[in-house]
Amino acid sequence: MSDKKGEEITLRVAEAFYRDVGRGVARIDPAVMEKYGLQSGDIIEIIGKSTVPAIVWPSYPEDRGTGIIRIDGSIRSNAGVGIDDKVRIRKVTAKPAEKVTLAPTEPVRLMGGEAYLLRLLEGRPVIKGQKIRVEVFGHTLTFVITATRPSGVVVVTRNTAIELKEKPAEEVKRAVPDVTYEDIGGLKRELRLVREMIELPLKHPELFQRLGIEPPKGVLLYGPPGTGKTLIAKAVANEVDAHFIPISGPEIMSKYYGESEQRLREIFEEAKENAPSIIFIDEIDSIAPKREEVTGEVERRVVAQLLALMDGLEARGDVIVIAATNRPDAIDPALRRPGRFDREIEIGVPDKEGRKEILEIHTRKMPLAEDVDLEELAELTNGFVGADLEALCKEAAMHALRRVLPEIDIEAEEIPAEVIENLKVTREDFMEALKNIEPSAMREVLVEVPNVKWEDIGGLEHAKQELMEAVEWPLKYPEVFRAANIKPPRGILLFGPPGTGKTLLAKAVANESNANFISVKGPELLSKWVGESEKHVREMFRKARQVAPCVIFFDEIDSLAPRRGGIGDSHVTERVVSQLLTELDGLEELKDVVVIAATNRPDMIDPALLRPGRLERHIYIPPPDKKARVEIFKIHLRGKPLADDVNIEELAEKTEGYSGADIEAVCREAGMLAIRELIKPGMTREEAKEAAKKLKITKKHFEEALKKVRPSLTKEDVEKYEKLIEDFHRMYA
C-alpha cells in the first residue's frame, strides 16, 4: 500500500457540512487531531467495510471532544458506512498520481470529459475501486477508478494523465438512488424522525427484540408538493443500504380483475426476498383513497389488499413502507392506524433558516459572485419550497448564461477557458430569476407582492403608522414581540368613503413587509353549492399559512360577511361568516398571517367579526385634507410635463371634497386635454413624435378638467361618515 502508515483511531461518523460536499474532505474533532498529531491537509484512510482516502480538516469548535468525523455521502458510500457507525482512520503518505483510469457505471460519452474530471479531482487523494460522483447538467454521473499509477493512495495533480474509458465498469447496479442526507436542506427535525423510525429497525433489530416490541412498519410523509418527501425516502434508502422499490399509483392499477392486487403482492414479495428493503409509495392517495368515496371496484380491492399486506398474518421481515401524499385526508382511514402507517410526519414549507440551507445545497457547485447574499435570498423567498428554490437557482444560472452567450461561438469545438473562468452568477441574476419564479403553492391563488411603496400614498400618515405597527413590525421584527410576550393584532379593518386609498394602503403594507399578498374579492368566494364557499375560505387560509408571512386582503368585506339574521339574508353568507370567525380566532393558530379588510359600509359587517382577536384594529381612512391633497397631486404629476403656470397649492385649494381617486382622475383628464390639443386629424406618427417634444400640461387644462371631474364626496356624505364613525366607536370602544 503506501509507504508509511500511522496508528489507527476509531471515530463516529456524522454528516458533512453542506459546503464540504463533493470535496473529498473529512472534518475531525480538533481534540483528536491534537492528540494524534494530525495536521490540516494530511491524508488519511477511512476504514469501514472498505477503505477510502480523504483530506483532513479540523471540525468546528462545537465538535470538540465528541470524537466524530464528518464525511459526505460519497465518502460514506465508498467506505460502506452510515451515520453513527464507527470507522477506523489512519494517516498515510500518498504519492503524486502519474495516471488515473476511470470508467463510468453506465454507458455515457462526455466531450472533454478528461479535462473536466482533472479539474474536479485536482488535489484530491484517490484509490483504486473508489467511486466518484460528478454533476453534469443537473444529472449525477458515477465513475469508478479502475487503475492508478503508482498503486495505493495517490493524489491527483495538474500533471496527472486522466484516462476515461467508454465501456462501463462491470459492477452490480444497486436499485438505490444516489441521494445522501447532505442533499436535503431545511428538514433536520423531520429527517431525524424518519431516520429513527427506519434506520434503527433495519440496522439494529436486536434493540426492538430486547424491548419486546414490533419495529415500526410504515411511515406516512405528508405535506405540500415540492417539499422533499420523495427525496427523504431516496436518501434513507441510500444511507441504510437497503433495496429500494418505488411504486407510483397508476403503475399498479389495471382494469383486469385481480391484476392490481397481484402486482402489489409481487412487489411485497420482491421486497421480502431482497431484505432489508424499503417500499416507497408515492401519491398514495391515488391508490388507497377512502373506500366510501370511490365508485370503482378496483380501488376498493387495492385498498383491501394493501391493508392485508401491511398488517397481514405473514411477518413482513425487514421491509418498511414509506408513503408520501399531499392529501392525507383523502387516504382510507384504516391505513392511518398503528401497525400500518405507525407514524405520520409532516414535511412542511421551510422557514428562513431552512431556505438558506436549501440555497446552500443548490449553489454549492455554482460560481457565485461576491455580491450574492444567500441570507438575503432566504428573506425574499417566503413560501418557497425546496423544488421552487431549486428552480430559482437554475433560472439564475440560465440568466448568467444568457448574459455571456453573445461572447460564445456556439460552432467552436471548445469554449475558451477564460470565458468559462469568468462565468459567474451574480445577485442581479437571482433578482431577475425571482421575477419569473413564484411559490408553487400559490400558482392557483394569485399571490403577488404589489409594487406600491409608502411614498406612493399621499397623506394618511396616521393610517400608515398604525398599519406599520400592526403588520410590518411583527413580520420584520418578531424577536421584539417575543421579548415583550405580546401577540400582534390578527386583523385590521380599513373603512372610509370610496376612493380614499384603502386598497392602496393594503398593497403598500404587503410590499413594505416583504409578505406575500392574497387579494380576495367577495363574490369569487361565494358559490351556490352547499359547503363550497366555506371550503374556499378554508383553502385560502391554509394556503396563506403555507406561504407565511402573508397578508390576506378582503376588499368590500361587507358583501362577504354581512350581519347575520338580517332580512333577506342568505344562508351562504351566514356560513361564510361562521367560517371566517373560526379561521380568524379558531383553535388553529394563524402564525405570521395578517388579515386586512376594507369597506365603506362598516355598519353592515357582522359585529362578531369586529371584536378583539378578529378584525380588532379599526382604522378610519378620511377624505384627504389640503396638505394630503398637495401630496396626492405631487405623486400623480410625477414625471408629467407641467407648464410653469401650474400651481399645485392652488389646485389643492380648489379640490375640497375630492378623494384620492378623484384627484388621479383630474390629473389624467388634464393630460388627455393637452394630448387632444396636440394631435391634429391626419397627423403622421413622425409628426406626432416631433410635436410630443413641445407637450405641456397647463393651468387651463386643469381648470377644464376640474369642470369635468366632479368630487365624488358631498359635504353630506362626509358628515354621514363622521356620524357613522362616532356610532361605530361607541359600539366597539
Swiss-Prot record:
Gene Ontology molecular-function annotations: ATP binding; ATP hydrolysis activity
Protein's UniProt keywords contain Transcription: no
Residue numbers binding ATP: 223-230, 496-503
Domain of life: Archaea
Pfam assignment, any one: Vps4_C
Disulfide bonds listed in the record: none
Alphabetically ordered keywords of this record: ATP-binding, Nucleotide-binding, Repeat
GO CC, one annotated term: cytoplasm
InterPro entries in the record: AAA+_ATPase (IPR003593), AAA_ATPase_CDC48 (IPR005938), AAA_ATPase_domain (IPR050168), AAA_lid_3 (IPR041569), Asp_de-COase-like_dom_sf (IPR009010), ATPase_AAA_core (IPR003959), ATPase_AAA_CS (IPR003960), Cdc48_dom2 (IPR004201)
Protein family membership: Belongs to the AAA ATPase family. CDC48 subfamily.
Name of the protein this chain belongs to: Cell division cycle protein 48 homolog AF_1297
Record organism: Archaeoglobus fulgidus (strain ATCC 49558 / DSM 4304 / JCM 9628 / NBRC 100126 / VC-16)
